[in-house]
Amino acid sequence: MDIFKELILKHTDENVLISPVSILSTLSILNHGAAGSTAEQLSKYIENMNENTPDDNNDMDVDIPYCATLATANKIYGSDSIEFHASFLQKIKDDFQTVNFNNANQTKELINEWVKTMTNGKINSLLTSPLSINTRMTVVSAVHFKAMWKYPFSKHLTYTDKFYISKNIVTSVDMMVSTENNLQYVHINELFGGFSIIDIPYEGNSSMVIILPDDIEGIYNIEKNITDEKFKKWCGMLSTKSIDLYMPKFKVEMTEPYNLVPILENLGLTNIFGYYADFSKMCNETITVEKFLHTTFIDVNEEYTEASAVTGVFMTNFSMVYRTKVYINHPFMYMIKDNTGRILFIGKYCYPQ
């Protein structure tokens, strides 16, 4: 949550999306080559991040069976002019590759092609410009997620509706509709404002959690006040409700990758990127991480595969049931998590692309 909060401070009126699992995985790879105070900082930070995941699920492998695509791309690129220790290379295996940073354009194309392959073409370009020829090591993290809704939205119900970017700025979106579904929902009033939380399940073990402020511009107060502890507390208050859900189709694709170096430095990882960096378990030369790039892509729509295109007739006793209507028509926060509570993605959507 802390990396996300740092990012949204820098991108106040922009869509933001990161994958904490992917970032943590890459930091864990770096930790294999770290020593001294660098290893201490990395180990402490990784431990703190793992405290916010279930005890039995602190490995970086995420299991989302048969129902979703989770394509991740994590890699460390090291200069071919440096001799890296065999013990380090053995630990990280396929996550490391040597390149000639003097051939800047060739290296750029190599990295972009690898990312494109690893994400099944969903992320076509991570690097928009060549890396510096002085680069000695670069960390790259990319991820793409796609899943089928447990309760698919009917395409014929999708309609054009208003989306309030702010109280004074309105645009149009394709609004998806899903009615009479039993979903996990709660409305909460905090000192900083009221908001609704709704848990929308995918087939299998994952779900999307939406935090929708009551006020059109209330997302800023949620951003300032949300913590991992508060999020867990709020999710513990969810209960099953009959919901009519109105949710915009949306797509978030980064035009430029995030360079997380300054953010990670602000969060205490100062001995990774600067003069005091100690990666002596990686190689004998004095090197430091110069870039920590992260990019993401997400596509939220009505789609489902043929395997889930099943028609069923269910008969029940008729009764008058109060249904809660949830209109997601202004900026909101969202998380995609597995059934253990591990957050795979966290994002803010405030500006239709």
Curated annotation (Swiss-Prot):
It is found in: Host cytoplasm. One of its GO terms (molecular function) is serine-type endopeptidase inhibitor activity. The gene is OPG208. One of its GO terms (cellular component) is host cell cytoplasm. Keywords: Early protein, Host cytoplasm, Protease inhibitor, Serine protease inhibitor. It holds the Pfam family Serpin. The record marks F318, S319 as: Reactive bond. This is Serine proteinase inhibitor 1. Its main location: host cell. Plays a role in mediating viral host range. May act to inhibit a caspase independent form of apoptosis to allow efficient virus replication in infected cells. Belongs to the serpin family. Poxviruses subfamily.
